[in-house]
Amino acid sequence: MTSRNYLLLTPGPLTTSRTVKEAMLFDSCTWDDDYNIGVVEQIRQQLTALATASEGYTSVLLQGSGSYAVEAVLGSALGPQDKVLIVSNGAYGARMVEMAGLMGIAHHAYDCGEVARPDVQAIDAILNADPTISHIAMVHSETTTGMLNPIDEVGALAQRYDKTYIVDAMSSFGGIPMDIAALHIDYLISSANKCIQGVPGFAFVIAREQKLAACKGHSRSLSLDLYAQWRCMEDNHGKWRFTSPTHTVLAFAQALKELAEEGGVAARHQRYQQNQRSLVAGMRALGFNTLLDDELHSPIITAFYSPEDPQYRFSEFYRRLKEQGFVIYPGKVSQSDCFRIGNIGEVYAADITALLTAIRTAMYWTK
């Protein structure tokens, strides 16, 4: 481990502001009203307001990574007679399929391939053919490739077929404007260390209260019982059932303040989008090609094909970039040799320019 700080060009954990880090210097008591009412309850209200102005929604915080919350929703929202259609076009959709299988949840996996946009007509046909499907689950920003999936079109199908709609918005909520009521989303899942620019330690679910209230007794897990966690927070004014990650929560409260100071989700989305466009333009000028067509890209992370030069090794490229203060991500696509660069967090136009200069310097195979 080194004391040197790097700029993380990853989809989270990501580079955070100095003030978000400093917020963790305070120690909180998990029984204290100053913490539970003054911090946790405020966060819950702010998250719900960020998601929609409509009534009837609530939020629940849950210890662990984003995958913990995804598993909590799947394991709590689906009763023993329910069945979920899981739309999968990457590692995170595939993870939902794996979770459902391990929990014994009836499911239909629609796998459209890692570089293909989900076919809404195909989803329509599946729903039409199988009336036993009660829920639909999908990822919004699939960071395996950087693809932004059509949650609006699938949401319209969920409304038409009267299905409960679950969206993993891990790498989009807080960075892409959305109204979950207008999108017909019943459960939206995200994490502290993504677009809101906090640090790892907890995830959260913003849910239609009527749906969440019907989940009692469904959970396949004690710790991941979303209904029980919600009732504890509701009945005890922000109290967590088990140990609260207090320092992470304080950092997140500060991150929410900084989101508002930046101009809210719309302003942050504009920054992320400009970062991504500048990154792609600069990488293409250096000779790199994107895995996806431009119209499929999210403003969060971009996958680039690895150079075909036989001298190229990602590990060496990574090392040379890290020496210059930049950290990127390896590829996760099974059928293509690629690497990924994220552009969220405390990353601005000057950082993208500096990164591109560092990449040019690190391209040892061209020398």
Curated annotation (Swiss-Prot):
**BP-aspect Gene Ontology terms:** organic phosphonate catabolic process
Q: Which reactions is this enzyme annotated as catalysing?
A: (2-aminoethyl)phosphonate + pyruvate = phosphonoacetaldehyde + L-alanine
> In the record, which positions carry N6-(pyridoxal phosphate)lysine?
194
Q: Which cofactor does it need?
A: pyridoxal 5'-phosphate
Pfam families associated with the record: Aminotran_5
User: What does this chain do?
Assistant: Involved in phosphonate degradation.
Concerning its family, UniProt says: Belongs to the class-V pyridoxal-phosphate-dependent aminotransferase family. PhnW subfamily.
**Quaternary structure per UniProt?**
Homodimer.
- What protein name is recorded for this chain? 2-aminoethylphosphonate--pyruvate transaminase
* Natural source organism: Salmonella paratyphi C (strain RKS4594)
